[in-house]
Each structure stands twice: as C-alpha cells, then as structure tokens.
Amino acid sequence: MKSDTITRIVLVGLLAVFVIFTLLAGFLGDLYWFLEIGYEDVFLSIITTRIILGIAGFVVFFGFSYGCAIIAARTASGSLGRPAGGRQGIAALALFASLIAGLNLSAAWETVLRFFAQVPFGVSDPIFSQDIGFYVFSLPFYSLVLSFLLGLFIFAAILSALAFLFQVLVVRVRGGQFPTFDIEAETEPVWGVFFSEFLPQLNILLFLVFVALAARLWLFRYSILYSSTGAVFGAGYTDIHITLPVTTILSVVALIIGIGFLLNEKIQRKEVIIYSIAAFAGIVIIGIVAALLVQSLVVEPDEFTLEKQYLDYNIQNTLDAYDLSRAEEEIFQVNYTLTAEDIRENRATVENIRLWDWRPLKSTYEQLQLFRTYYQFYDVDVDRYMVDGMYKQVLISPREMDIGSLPSQAQTWVNQHLVYTHGYGVVMNPVDVVTTEGLPAFYIKDIPPTSPYFTIDEPRIYYGEGAASYAVTRTSTDEFDYPAGDQNIYTDYDGTGGVALDGIVKKLIYAIKFNSVELLVSGSLTPDSRLLFNRNVAERTAQIAPFLSYDADPYIVVADGRLYWIIDAYTTTDAYPYSEPVMAWNIGSGERLNYIRNSVKVVVDAYNGDVSYYIIDPADPIVSTYDRMFPGVFQGIEEMPDSLSSHLRYPEDFFRIQAQLYTIYHMKDPRVFYNREDAWVIPDELYRQQRQQMVPYYIIMKLPGEEEEEFIMMLPFTPRNKENLIGWMAARSDQPVYGDLLVYQFSKQELTYGPMQVEARIDQDTAISQDITLWSQSGSDVVRGNTLIIPIENSLLYVEPLYLEASERGTLPQLKRVIVVYNDRLTMQETLSDALSVIFEEGTGTPEGGEEPRPPISETDLERLARIADLYDRAQQALSRGDLGQYQRYFDEIGDLVKG
C-alpha cells in the first residue's frame, strides 16, 4: 500500500513537472520571439494584465465564497455543539469555481485595458445622450465587473447554504436521527435549524445579490439600443415606452428587495425571501407580456408613424458606423456619344481594362511558372505600378514553397525544416496584354526573376501566405535556393529574422514548444542557427496584435528591390447603438459587427519578417485607444515609405460590407426606407456559365470630373427584382484621396444595361454562340470571365473575356476572345483593340440580331486545338512519372503548334 502511494505521488509529481515545463516553454518561446521582432512590450503588457486579473479574480472569488461557507459551517456546528467538518469538500468547490472565475476575468484583458485607455467618439446616442465610447468601452467593463460580483454573491450564498446543511445533516446522521425536511415538523427539523440559525447570514448575502442585480439591470437599460424587436435594429417604440420603464422599475425593485433582506436580518422571517423573489418574477412576466401586447396591438397597426424617429436613428447611426456618411452621391447622366477620339484620349483607362481574370490566370501561372511541384501560387492579386512611365494595372503572385507537395520519400524533418525553407520571386503581368498564343505577357517571370522594368535584389520569400511550419537557417545542411536546369542552387540565410538557437536552453524550449526532439539533438544546428516561426503573415500579424481583425487577402508588393506583404487590419465592435449588425465572414475568423474601420495597414518584410503597423485613419477612436494601450506599436501613415504607400488598396472585404449595406441605406428618407421603395441589390453575372453575384473589381480609370486616371475599386448596383443598372459605387485608393467613397446614380427614366442583360445579349448573338459551341465540341472548356463595366466619359463600355482550356485537370487557360458591348453594338474579336476598332472606328460591329455573323473557326484550327489538348494530357502523364525530359518535349511541340 505504501509503495502504491509513493508511485502515485511520483506520477503526479512528474505530470506536474511536465505541465509546468510545457507552459514555461510556451511562454519563454513566445517571449524570445517577441524580443526578436521588437514587440515584447505588447506581449508583456497583455500577459501581465491577464495574470493580474486572473490572480485578483481567483483570490477575491475564493476568499469571499470560502470565507462565507466557513462562517456558515461554524454557525451550524456551533448551534449543534459539534466542531465544523467537511472543509475539504467546501474548499474543492470554491477552488474550482474560483479558477473558472479567474480564467474568465483573465480572458477579459482587452475589455479592461480599453476602458482605462478609451478615447471618446465625440458623438452621442439619441436616447440617453451618452458618448458612443460609453457603449464601446465603458459599458462592457461595468458589465464585466457586475457580472463577476453577481456570480460571486450567488455562488457564495449557494456554497454557504450547502456548508450549513452539510453540517446539520452530518450531526443528525451521526446522532442516529433520520433527517427531515418537513418545515412543520416538531422534532427540530433541518429546515428549522436552517432558517433559525443561517437566515441572518443568508439575508446579508441576498442583499448583496440583489444590489448587484439592481446595478446590472440599471446597466441593462442601455442594452435596449441593440434591440431587434421593432422595425429596425435599435430601440423602437415598444422598447422606449415599455421595456425601458419596466427595466428601470425592476432595477429599483431589486434594490428595495435587497434592502428588505438586510432589514430581515432583524425580523428573521423566511416569508420575506419567498414573497420578494415571487414579486420580482411577477414584474418580469408582466413586463414581457406588456411588451408583446403593445408591439402587436399598438405598434404594428401603425408601425411607421410610431417608429419613424427610430428609423431615422438607425439610418444615421448605421451610415456613421460603417463610414458611409461621407459617401458623395452624384448623378451619372449616361449618353452614348463616344468616338474613337474619346477612346484615344482615355488610353490609360482602356489599356488597363482587366482582361485577365485571376482564377484562370492562376492556372496559367501554375503551368508556365511553377517549374517544380514543390512551389505554389496561393493567390493572384491586383495592384498598380509605374511601368516605363505609364500607370499600369497588374496581376502579381508570389512563388511560395509548399513542402506538402514534396514526394512522400522526401518528407523528412531535414527537408521540411532545414532544406526547403523559402519561396522564390514573383510573377507579374499587365492586366490587358495577351500574346498571340493567348497567354499573359510577363513583366516579371522565371527563376531567378527576370524583368525589363523591375529589379528584385532579394527575391526569397521566408514569410508568406503558405509558410505554415517553422524553418531553421544557418545550419550545416545546404539550404535549397532555386532550381537551375538539372542542378539546384543553394544558399545561406543572411537576414535578421528568427530566434537565435545559441544555447541548449533555447533548443530545449523550442523542442518542447514544437514537440520536435530534432531541434535538441540534430547535429546540423550550429551556434549561428536561427529558428524562423510564425511565418504565415496573417498569423504573424495576429500574434503580435490580436486586438485587431485582419483581412483575408494579404498581397505582395515589389518595392526598393525587395518583396513586402501588405495586410489590411480593421477595428471593429458590435456595440455601436442603433447600427445594423452584419456577419463579416472574411474578416478575422468571422465576426458579427456593427462598426468597422480599415484603420491600420500592416507591412511584413518577406525576407526578414519585420512587421510594421501604420495608422491610416487617425479619426477612429478605437485605433486611438489601442495606440494609448500599446504606445510605440503604431506609426503614422506618413512614415510609410512612398514606395509602399503607393500600393495601398481600398480593401475588398470592407468595400463589400459597405456596398451591401448601401443597397438599403442609401434610402435616407425614413418612409422610403421603411417601405423599401428604392432598394438596390448587387447584380449577378455569369462565370463559367454559372450565375453568381458580381464581385467588386479594381480598375484604373478617370472618374467623372477628374483630369487624371486613378486606381479605384468599383461595383455596380441594380434595382431589386430588376436587371438594369441603377448606379455604381467607387472607392479611391491613390493618395491624397485614399478612402473617398463615390456613388453615381443613373437616371430611373432611361434604361442602362445591367450585367445579366449584357450576358443575355451575348447569348443571343448567333456568331458568338456558334463559336462557343464549336470550341466546346473540340474538347475545350469555354470560360466566360467577369463582365466588367467600364465608365468612360459619360458612357459605359462592357467587356467580357473568353478563355479556352482543356477539359482535363491541370489545364493551361488561354485568352482567346474579347467581347465588347457598347450601346446597341456587340462584337467578339481576338483582341480588345480589334473589338474597339470594330465598334468605334469602323462602326460595323455586329448589332444585336445582325445578318452578317463572323466566319466560324476552321476545321484546321479545331484539329490543332485537339492535338494541343492531347499533347498536354501526355505531358501531364510524363510529369506524374517524373519524366521531365519527355514533359519538356511535349511542351516544345505544343509551342510549335501554337506558333503555327
């Protein structure tokens, strides 16, 4: 028996040591990392706050609840003439509850810090005249404190009652008496002792419970501004006239009941407890019933009249919360008087029309520019650069390392963490240029990167979208750099990123942290070795500043001969009064919010991993609060280098939220808003023959009334249940007008074609339909790209690219035709230039229902396409066998056929 006890003690001790070492390794591993990147103050501030809150919460909760229980136990034992027992069980319950309370309080570190560092919004709510900052910063803190106290007092009352009853029952059982809970029993029942001896202490605890409840209910009054019972989100007629006064009454009644319990300490009548709780419950029920009756019998029959002012509150606050109040509305008077001269004068717009859709282009990149199976293009992004003196919109994608694609026999620890450590270079092409083979014309391509316009001195990508695992650099093992024909080129990391593994202690820490004994025993590691982790740029930035929400689409930038990532960061809350909430699936991990600002731009060096946070919206009170919480973390946007600030984009996810809300909230008149008389929707388009909602797109164009082209994001709108255009929204990205929102509305008296109406016209064109059918019959898939609506002067040009790709997997999409629609003219040509020439210069584009369709594709071309598809399949089979020589020969033959 003794040996078993010793064994258990040893096992428990070993388990405790393991847990402590694991936690310590995690803490020290993170601390070294924060020291390396220079944000240790953020880490230590958060950790310190969490520890203080956790310990304070635990000590207060345990001390009060356990103390009350011990007093109750002593009271019971004293009245029965027996010493108190069962303290271990009471202590265990108190410890468990206190641990949960401490952890919950520790998790609320951000609420506490934001309260003490808060910056006012300078705007008040329309009901209580409180600054919005009260709801965003103060109310959550007060609610946290009161919820903690309310939970503490309730638990203390329950634990004390259990402790008292336990003592009474133990004494009775030991005395041989069967305990009775009959209140009317004459032989000293349990309840008799309970109410006679424990009632004074219970009265005090219930006094504290109801005082805390009264304060909590008083705060709850402000929560009616988030009500959804009326015509809109926010307090409505019923909330103001029923819920608010009932909640106020409940708060006062709870306070009176609490005082009653305190007075009952002298009266000592158990009926006071029962009647008080019953009265409180009765008022709650009456309030609920009254609210339902008023809403259904009073409000709903005359809803607009009674809810009008609250509708107005909702409209204004929603526009403010989503930064839509500053959207400038203009009338866009459409005319169709464009000439060839107008097209030439708007050359910068025309030459930046995005013919390449990122989805087929990604497949093209993979076929032409991966070179090895362990590389990956995770995404293709849109940006703009000055190229040879011209402002050009481009598509760009980094070539990242994907160690998961290594052959199974190569999936070793050395290969995964020491050899294949980084990606290499980027691929870039202009959005409008297509080769004669239907392929992109590259600005940057190949390994090492070659370009007539750009110099990339450091093309290596150690930090990216796909860098999920850690890497160890400066080891005795050669680090793969890039392939060069049949040979591999190797390198040694020369950057500043990573934690130095300069001692056995650090190696042990990270071996535990990453559950990797190789970090401790590998002979490849040297005193100069560096451990690079948190290399995924989205996770890296969130690790440093978890209080921000991050966009799902980081994008890479070529600047000053290096590669950088730019990530949009948001400040959000769901506590803005009267603002309509939305579910933002692509922001953070998916958030419900009713306020958002794109206040921060984050830059990550792809080689060193350096992270910089720049405030782009200093008027945002939330980011100003964070700046107070963590001084030194943020820089002003004016401190961002021009080579990077020239690539800032208005984020798509933010724009989508704003555009979706604006379809309803452009109706600022409460009656029009209530009836949804002028509701808009985001239109649909065809992509791969499937109908889908149109997505916002970037474009370089000259806005109405402006002299120069600029980089904007735009999205059209159509009326609800109709297909014609009603307007479009634009967000500007260039300095100094970054962030400006413009909304252009079309005349409601004239028809302006929407995307699906243009798609219908294309489908009805016999020549286009004939070509698409022939392509499909030749074994190719026809991919219809995005329908782009291009405003030029006061006209609209519709452009849709067509791609061909083989039906099999691993295709090489080629841009084969461009469809242009203008007014009543429609044409499909091999290039955009040809299509514009047909419509504007020759003036002989095929009108809808025209009698002279273009000649179909020749049989020779069809045979050539079929041969290309066959060769491509053979090339893929050779690649899967690892026969790179045969793979190259097949592609050489494909090249000959394409050129022929």
PLM feature spans:
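Soluble extracytoplasmic regions of secretory-pathway and membrane proteins
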Residues: D4, V10-R881, G885-V898
